[in-house]
Amino acid sequence: MKLLHPAFQSCLLLTLLGLWRTTPEAHASSPGAPAISAASFLQDLIHRYGEGDSLTLQQLKALLNHLDVGVGRGNVTQHVQGHRNLSTCFSSGDLFAAHNFSEQSRIGSSELQEFCPTILQQLDSRACTSENQENEENEQTEEGWPSAVEVWGYGLLCVTVISLCSLLGASVVPFMKKTFYKRLLLYFIALAIGTLYSNALFQLIPEAFGFNPLEDYYVSKSAVVFGGFYLFFFTEKILKILLKQKNEHHHGHSHYASETLPSKKDQEEGVMEKLQNGDLDHMIPQHCNSELDGKAPVVDEKVIVGSLSVQDLQASQSACYWLKGVRYSDIGTLAWMITLSDGLHNFIDGLAIGASFTVSVFQGISTSVAILCEEFPHELGDFVILLNAGMSIQQALFFNFLSACCCYLGLAFGILAGSHFSANWIFALAGGMFLYISLADMFPEMNEVCQEDERKGSILIPFVIQNLGLLTGFTIMVVLTMYSGQIQIG
């Protein structure tokens, strides 16, 4: 007798085995198979959450909390009227009252069976989904909130460090004509642009919309926004460099230099206009006029606001003028305008710092870093403008520091507003302000500082310094935003 093929034997054996396992007798004879009934599910719940054969009210509440049911804050007497508003998320007390449960009640199988449709309806309506998310966000926010001591302590410390920048102006006066000073100032201006712009993109504006960098994943999109800005900046600078070299090769001179240098006639007309308006008397003392021969362009209004040209004007004046006491009536109007505008600017800075610290210590320090990078070059420029407007060194230091102290007032308002109201509105205001300061105020100032080097033919070094400052500020803000959850302070 021939044996069957091994492969056919295996298939036949598997078929017989499958038929045997699917017969009802096999299931009935299986000793480990428990009998499943409707009551088994209720008994399992009572066994896991209760004691014996019943549940206490607290144990039933634990079951509801596990299912995210009964977490509302409503009143059943107000909502349950003729089957309306059943989509409301009820509290556990409301649900217990609807079934006449008291504190001493014991919930057995029959009571739990009657209570199950209530649980099923609340789960199906998803009424408590938004309530649970809000409760989780509130718990996370309350855990992350800094204490009052941390808010005021870190806030006062950061504002003090920022305000001390206003006293650094006098220390740099001897170095204003040095090449390294101008390039260092250029780096700080570019750094301020990078930090302010990136702080608005990565922290202030997203915080105003309620975004979380660890949950909403907006950092990459904000980086693309900065990339678009940087791409056009880089392309424009490269094109200017190439066109300048081409023009120098063909014509032997730069068209940019001819545009930035006014003619002698224009310079003289600018001086006469200032003399007629009476502004030049405040900007340049009579005994120093003889020292400014050939430097008439510095009195142009656009150049007076710029940091570099104002420093050239100040360096050309005699040091004895700075040390003289000046009557307040002899101080130019420009000095008071600068002091008032700088005070308002510092107040808004303090407002942003205070509101940031009420959210988290890390957010406050990030905002303070951006403001510090912006304040350093601005305070140096403001100090020189005050000197040129007729103030002595002592007066310039005093009023510059006085305007810087407005940051303390803004800090107090920011902390109080952020503690009692939503800080998102303050973040929105500060974000818009940071964008304006970085792009409309400091960016033209950075280009103006580069003009002298461009006229001399040294274009590459200022371009590299600008890129280093912008990318450094961008990197600082990206790192602070990405690792805000991992870095612990205090």
UniProtKB/Swiss-Prot annotation:
**What residue stretch is flagged as signal peptide?**
1-28
Where, per UniProt, does this protein localize? Cell membrane; Apical cell membrane; Basolateral cell membrane; Early endosome membrane
Q: Which residues are glycosylated?
A: N75, N85, N100
> Matching Pfam families, A to Z?
Zip
**A Gene Ontology cellular-component term:** apical plasma membrane
Q: Summarize what the UniProt record says about post-translational modification.
A: Ubiquitinated. Ubiquitination occurs upon iron depletion. The ubiquitinated form undergoes proteasomal degradation.
Query: How does the protein's chain sit in the membrane according to the entry?
Result: Multi-pass membrane protein
Q: Where is this motif: XEXPHE-motif?
A: 374-379
Q: Which reaction does it catalyse?
A: Zn(2+)(out) + 2 hydrogencarbonate(out) = Zn(2+)(in) + 2 hydrogencarbonate(in); Mn(2+)(out) + 2 hydrogencarbonate(out) = Mn(2+)(in) + 2 hydrogencarbonate(in); Fe(2+)(out) + 2 hydrogencarbonate(out) = Fe(2+)(in) + 2 hydrogencarbonate(in); Cd(2+)(out) + 2 hydrogencarbonate(out) = Cd(2+)(in) + 2 hydrogencarbonate(in)
| Complex and partners | Homotrimer.
Q: Please give the function described in this protein's UniProt entry.
A: Electroneutral transporter of the plasma membrane mediating the cellular uptake of the divalent metal cations zinc, manganese and iron that are important for tissue homeostasis, metabolism, development and immunity. Functions as an energy-dependent symporter, transporting through the membranes an electroneutral complex composed of a divalent metal cation and two bicarbonate anions. Beside these endogenous cellular substrates, can also import cadmium a non-essential metal which is cytotoxic and carcinogenic.
Q: What name appears for this protein in its UniProt entry? A: Metal cation symporter ZIP14
Native source organism of the sequence: Pongo abelii
Q: Which gene encodes it?
A: SLC39A14
